[in-house]
Amino acid sequence: MESFISFMQEIKKNNVRDALDKAISSGSLHCVVGLVASKDEILFEHAAGFRDEKKISPMNVDSILAIASSTKLITSIAALQLVEAGIITLDDPVSKYLPGLQDLKILDSFDGQELCLVPTKETPTIRQLMTHTSGYVYPFWNKNFFEADKNKTIKNLYAQDGYLEIPIAFEPGSRWAYGIGLDILGEVIKEVSQMSLYEYFSENIFQPLEMHDTAYQLSEEGFKRSVTMMQRLDNSFIASKPFQPSINSSYAKELGGEGLYSTAVDFSHVLQMLLNQGSYKGHKILSDSMIDLMFSNQTGSLEIVDSISQIPSITKDFNLSFGSKSHWGLGMIYHPEGTQYGRSKGSASGAGIFNTYYWVDREVGHCGFFSTQLVPFFDDKVIEAYQEFESSIYS
């Protein structure tokens, strides 16, 4: 740990800063923020570029970001708190808490008009919801669900109680596919806590972690610090109209798998807590044993595989293992062999569709956060910039 902190002296910080600045000066990104922290302190933070389309407002480390699927980490932590408290257990069927999912169906095929639905043998468990082995998928990366969603043949998460009518793509536990399991888990948290997700998160996670800028809804002050969502257009950028931040956000429903706004600094407090075995400034968020479960293989022989895009303008094909053998832990991607860009064996990571990425390396004793606000997800130039950022830290 001490060796890494000494490693992050001014010459090293300059190299990391240069990697971020290069992404802007080369035209690869319109804005970027990067942060590195130990369990006790922020070692490096830097922002570059502009957070608005007209290039008037500079990007800052406290700029408000739509963190999208990075919300899943918060939901996972909340669920593990409930496991610790004995309110739920990891291998309970989700129907124990949401009886409307007792007769869940599998979407076997879709011919453009009719859904072919078959019954499941088992109901997904809490653990399977957390590890993307439940059968719940995103239409973004599943052809049958994309076509059915496009034809409005199935409900989606945004409909009132829509989650009750969403089928799954395969028998729970039989495959791995990135999906909406954490959104379903969010419904479980609301049901057993009798609180909204924001109320639960605020009381049990945000307040003790001093995450004052993290919420589902933007305040007027937060909106003034928010970042315009951009879309790559050849060698330039345009505002991506469907995903713009607003004070009256479309995420009023509060989903467990997406929708939070945060900052690099706020989110780093979560990562620091994970580095410190569940503690942050005297507050114990999770037990040591729960933290260890998060950093362990929870999918057995099921490895992370490619997710093939159905909407290239929003997401590219992606694989979050970054070329190394990876599984899913409880809440994050687990890298038993590390990664080719320097992360240690047993490290963990995650991402959000607007190109937010983070990792936690317990062996070295640091965590990292990198974000722009851009679609499509896993954009080639974003990944190149992210890998240069990470490599400059580990080199």
Predicted regions and their residues:
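Short, conserved catalytic-motif segment at the N-terminal edge
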Residues: 7-67, 87-89, 103-110, 115
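Hydrophobic (often cysteine-bearing) scaffold residues that line and stabilize catalytic clefts
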Residues: 12, 16, 67, 71, ...
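Active-site SXXK
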Residues: 14-21, 40, 66-94, 103, ...
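Short loop/turn microsegments at loop-to-beta-strand junctions
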Residues: 30-32, 43, 196, 354-357
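A short, polar/charged loop-to-alpha-helix boundary motif
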Residues: 51-60, 377-388
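Short, surface-exposed loop or secondary-structure junction motifs
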Residues: 96, 102-342
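Short glycine-rich, acidic/polar surface loops and turns
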Residues: 319, 331, 351-360
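Short, well-ordered beta-strand elements
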Residues: 358-359, 365-374
